């Protein structure tokens, strides 16, 4: 069956749409019109492809992780190396596309939200390239966790606004960015960093990130002589790297798709971000999606060791894939992600982002289950430089606790 989502109202099955105040409706309709025009203009995509090649460094390699595969003794593991992009993660694919779109729309200023700082850095980078003014909204907690990325953004000419509302994390940064957009609609474009928000944002982000899956599909054929892998694995916060990998394979029903959610301290605690495991449908940031909420519909605080995964919702297309059982979403704890982080570093000499480490941790389990005849592609969504100090502190604290327990 042909997969034709979203419909004209921005729905993926029962999820998505645009639940925004009148003040924002004009902006999202203007954005949709401009995006449709750009899709119909071959020069837009040609220019973007040239930038992706010459500036970002695409295409990124599909790397056969031979050591990891042998270490596990299961399915062959191929890593889609989004960590090798300029700025160190998949985020630049979308940021560059949207800044180029904003420039074409005649906008002068760019605003964005960021959690781990990767989308903020990517947006500030693209804004610098196109000589546009840039403000990044970041939860105060994340500003503390990701001080290095804050400095990077400032170095790139962006202004970083620390958001002190709510729990001072990603969802609060999104709220602040949306408020700013309402106040400055005429000359400002808001670059959402994940496949979230009111239509057409989830579609735009998916389309710009689908370069991941398109490349991986062709590279897998070229490398193996086989048509398709047996499985895909990607971490899911809002879900843009995962939708970028999954979407070009969605009609290939022999390919199993797995999104790994942040289970934090465990899905049976209050400290996790496992939206599809524990959430239910609700409206957040202009879109109907699965959301972590209490009995009264209040949004719960999401928790993860990884700043890029602690979002209490998930992109509507992922909610739809989950609903129609096209993809499975599995929780991975902080502890498991830390093991994945160390394992890939030690065995392959690749230090992954904590976000990507959630995918690695599950891939290890899945490889054992599938066995050596099968193969999978794992999206290595970002590099781990930004997380090394945090992991060092965490491992040292864990070791000290163990020492006390043995004393």
Curated annotation (Swiss-Prot):
Alphabetized NCBIfam families for the sequence: trpB (TIGR00263)
Cofactor(s) named in the record: pyridoxal 5'-phosphate
Catalytic activity: (1S,2R)-1-C-(indol-3-yl)glycerol 3-phosphate + L-serine = D-glyceraldehyde 3-phosphate + L-tryptophan + H2O
Pathway given in the UniProt record: Amino-acid biosynthesis; L-tryptophan biosynthesis; L-tryptophan from chorismate: step 5/5
GO cellular component: cytoplasm
Keywords: Amino-acid biosynthesis, Aromatic amino acid biosynthesis, Lyase, Pyridoxal phosphate, Tryptophan biosynthesis
Gene Ontology MF terms in the entry: tryptophan synthase activity
Transmembrane domains' residue ranges: none
Repressor is among the record's keywords: no
Domain of life according to the entry: Bacteria
Alphabetized InterPro entries for the sequence: Trp_synth_b_CS (IPR006653), Trp_synth_beta (IPR006654), Trp_synth_beta/beta-like (IPR023026), TrpB-like_PALP (IPR001926), TrpB-like_PALP_sf (IPR036052)
Complex and partners: Tetramer of two alpha and two beta chains.
Amino-acid biosynthesis among keywords: yes
Modification N6-(pyridoxal phosphate)lysine, positions: 91
Role according to the record: The beta subunit is responsible for the synthesis of L-tryptophan from indole and L-serine.
UniProt-recorded name of the protein: Tryptophan synthase beta chain
UniProt EC number: 4.2.1.20
Homology family: Belongs to the TrpB family.
One Pfam short name: PALP
């Amino acid at each position: 069956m042909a997969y034709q989502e979203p419909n004209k109202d921005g729905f993926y099955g029962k999820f998505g749409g645009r639940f925004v105040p009148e003040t924002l409706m004009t902006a999202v309709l203007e954005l949709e019109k401009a995006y449709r025009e750009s899709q119909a203009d071959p020069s837009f995509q040609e220019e973007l492809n040239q930038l992706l090649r010459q500036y970002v460094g695409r295409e990124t390699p599909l790397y056969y992780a031979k050591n990891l595969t042998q270490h596990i003794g299961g399915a062959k593991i191929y890593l889609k190396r989004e960590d090798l992009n300029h700025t160190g993660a998949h985020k630049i694919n979308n940021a560059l596309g949207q800044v180029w779109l904003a420039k074409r729309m005649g906008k002068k200023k760019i605003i964005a939200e960021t959690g781990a700082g990767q989308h903020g850095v990517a947006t500030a980078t693209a804004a610098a390239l196109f000589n546009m003014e840039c403000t990044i909204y970041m939860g105060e907690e994340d500003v503390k966790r990701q001080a290095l990325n804050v400095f990077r953004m400032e170095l790139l000419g962006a202004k970083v606004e620390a958001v002190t509302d709510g729990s001072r994390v990603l969802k609060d940064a999104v709220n602040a960015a949306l408020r700013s957009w309402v106040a400055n609609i005429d000359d400002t474009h808001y670059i959402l960093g994940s496949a979230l928000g009111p239509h057409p944002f989830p579609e735009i982000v998916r389309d710009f990130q689908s370069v991941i899956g398109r490349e991986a599909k062709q590279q897998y054929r070229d490398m193996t002589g086989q048509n398709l892998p047996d499985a895909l694995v990607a971490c899911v916060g809002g879900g843009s790297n995962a939708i970028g990998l999954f979407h070009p394979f969605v009609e290939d029903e022999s390919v199993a798709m797995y999104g790994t959610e942040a289970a934090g301290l465990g899905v049976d605690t209050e400290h996790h971000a496992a939206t599809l495991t524990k959430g239910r449908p609700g409206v957040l940031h202009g879109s109907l999606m699965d959301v972590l909420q209490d009995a009264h519909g209040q949004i719960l605080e999401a928790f993860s060791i990884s700043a890029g995964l602690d979002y209490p919702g998930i992109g509507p297309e992922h909610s739809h894939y989950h609903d129609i059982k096209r993809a499975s979403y599995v929780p991975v704890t902080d502890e498991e992600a830390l093991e994945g982080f160390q394992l890939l570093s030690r065995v392959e000499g690749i230090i992954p982002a904590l976000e990507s480490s959630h995918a690695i941790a599950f891939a290890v389990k899945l490889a054992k289950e599938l066995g050596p005849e099968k193969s999978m592609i794992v999206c290595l969504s970002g590099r781990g430089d930004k997380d090394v100090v945090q992991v060092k502190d965490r491992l040292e604290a864990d070791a000290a606790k163990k020492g006390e327990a043995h004393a």
